[in-house]
């Protein structure tokens, strides 16, 4: 009798426990059955857990996959990015050698300056050397730029172009041939420029242009073309102005004398040493032509 009562009590307790656990269990797929909950994300743990996910179609990825054409360079085709980091914070692209792309060449050049006896060198662009280098460049621009006079070879170039279009050899070309002459010399004037030029010639020059007028018209264009271009020939000519003894190198005394002539005042010995220290890459205390070119193109 006692054993029968114990079995009944155990069954009763099991039924009560099952009822208690079943009453607290959430209905499965409630979001799919209830129309009011469709399209809403259920709060709770990770949506990938099968115990808490609703309809599999209602799952949302943690990060929107990036289209193929917007993906990061080097990522596998068709796969989303690993995380949603903004594109601006991505590290810069690197080449095969491991160096970052897009670095200015001047950084590597300036970083290659050697250590000097008086301590670390003043990097390019320091206050010690810059004022004088900034004064030297306008001097060369005035010698080879737009505010200079035409050189003999440039005047000869204009003369040859003028002769080619002076068909009757009377020393004049008409305004209609001036546009073709300009195109022959490599200039491409617009129609508006040609109209204005023709009006100027017809009003002031009687419709014809002699050689002096031609030089006055074309000279500024020729100078403007070469204003920002200092070629090897011009740089060698400028280097010879500094290298007075012709040994192929500019010494401290030669640089000081050349700067005195160009700037119109004497430059101190210490300032000259700072300039040479700033541009002397091989450390011999003198400036050769290659270093001079680097100095003027910086």
From Swiss-Prot:
Residues 1-10 have a biased composition (Basic and acidic residues). Residues 1-131 are annotated as: Disordered. Phosphorylated. The phosphorylation regulates the activity. One of its GO terms (cellular component) is subplasmalemmal coating. GO terms for biological process: modification of postsynaptic actin cytoskeleton; negative regulation of cell communication by electrical coupling; negative regulation of protein import into nucleus; postsynapse to nucleus signaling pathway; regulation of synaptic plasticity; visual perception. One of its GO terms (molecular function) is nuclear localization sequence binding. Somatodendritic compartment of neurons. Restricted expression in retina to a subpopulation of amacrine, bipolar, and ganglion cells. According to PubMed:11906216, expression is heterogeneous within brain regions and their major cell types and does not match with those of marker proteins for characterized neuronal subpopulations. Isoform 2: Minor isoform expressed in the brain, in the granule cell layer of the cerebellum, at low level. Not developmentally regulated. Isoform 3: Minor isoform expressed in the brain, in the granule cell layer. of the cerebellum, at low level. Ca(2+) 3 binds at residues 280, 282, 284, 286, 291. Ca(2+) 1 binds at residues 166, 168, 170, 172, 177. InterPro entries: CaBP1/2/4/5, EF-hand-dom_pair, EF_Hand_1_Ca_BS, EF_hand_dom. The modification Phosphoserine is found at residue 251. It is found in: Cytoplasm; Cytoplasm, Cytoskeleton. CDD domains: EFh (cd00051). Residues 153-188, 207-224, 230-265, 267-298 form the EF-hand domain. Ca(2+) 2 binds at residues 243, 245, 247, 249, 254. Keywords: Calcium, Cytoplasm, Cytoskeleton, Developmental protein, Metal-binding, Phosphoprotein, Repeat, Sensory transduction, Vision. EF-1 binds magnesium constitutively under physiological conditions, EF-3 and EF-4 bind calcium cooperatively and EF-2 binds neither calcium nor magnesium. Interacts with ITPR1, ITPR2 and ITPR3. The strength of this interaction inversely correlates with calcium concentration. Interacts with CACNA1A (via C-terminal CDB motif) in the pre- and postsynaptic membranes. Interacts with CACNA1C. Interacts with CACNA1D. Interacts (via EF-hands 1 and 2) at microtubules with MAP1LC3B. Interacts (via EF-hands 1 and 2) with NSMF (via the central NLS-containing motif region), the interaction occurs in a calcium dependent manner after synaptic NMDA receptor stimulation and prevents nuclear import of NSMF. Interacts with MYO1C and TRPC5. Interacts with SPACA9. Modulates calcium-dependent activity of inositol 1,4,5-triphosphate receptors (ITPRs). Inhibits agonist-induced intracellular calcium signaling. Enhances inactivation and does not support calcium-dependent facilitation of voltage-dependent P/Q-type calcium channels. Causes calcium-dependent facilitation and inhibits inactivation of L-type calcium channels by binding to the same sites as calmodulin in the C-terminal domain of CACNA1C, but has an opposite effect on channel function. Suppresses the calcium-dependent inactivation of CACNA1D. Inhibits TRPC5 channels. This is Calcium-binding protein 1. It comes from Rattus norvegicus. The lineage of its organism: Eukaryota, Metazoa, Chordata, Craniata, Vertebrata.
């Amino acid at each position: 009798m006692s054993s029968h009562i114990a079995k009944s009590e155990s069954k009763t307790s099991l039924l009560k426990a099952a009822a208690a656990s079943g009453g607290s269990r959430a209905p499965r797929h409630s979001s799919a059955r209830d129309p009011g909950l469709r399209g809403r994300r259920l709060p709770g743990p990770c949506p990938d857990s099968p115990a808490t996910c609703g309809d599999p179609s209602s799952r949302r990825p943690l990060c929107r996959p990036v289209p193929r054409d917007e993906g990061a360079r080097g990522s596998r085709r068709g796969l989303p990015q690993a995380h949603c980091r903004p594109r601006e914070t991505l590290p810069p692209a690197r080449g095969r050698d491991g160096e970052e792309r897009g670095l200015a060449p001047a950084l590597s050049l300036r970083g290659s300056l050697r250590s000097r006896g008086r301590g670390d060198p003043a990097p390019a662009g320091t206050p010690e050397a810059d004022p004088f280098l900034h004064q030297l460049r306008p001097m060369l621009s005035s010698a080879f730029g737009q505010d200079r006079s035409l050189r003999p070879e440039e005047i000869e170039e204009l003369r040859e172009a003028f002769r080619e279009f002076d068909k009757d050899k009377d020393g004049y070309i008409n305004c209609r041939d001036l546009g073709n002459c300009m195109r022959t010399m490599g200039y491409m004037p617009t129609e508006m420029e040609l109209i204005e030029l023709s009006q100027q010639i017809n009003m002031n020059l009687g419709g014809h242009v002699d050689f002096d007028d031609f030089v006055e018209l074309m000279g500024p264009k020729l100078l403007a073309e070469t204003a920002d271009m200092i070629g090897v020939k011009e740089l060698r000519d400028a280097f010879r102005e500094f290298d007075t003894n012709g040994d192929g190198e500019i010494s401290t005394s030669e640089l000081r004398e050349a700067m005195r002539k160009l700037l119109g005042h004497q430059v101190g010995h210490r300032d000259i040493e700072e300039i040479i220290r700033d541009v002397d890459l091989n450390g011999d205390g003198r400036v050769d032509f290659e270093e001079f070119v680097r100095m003027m193109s910086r």
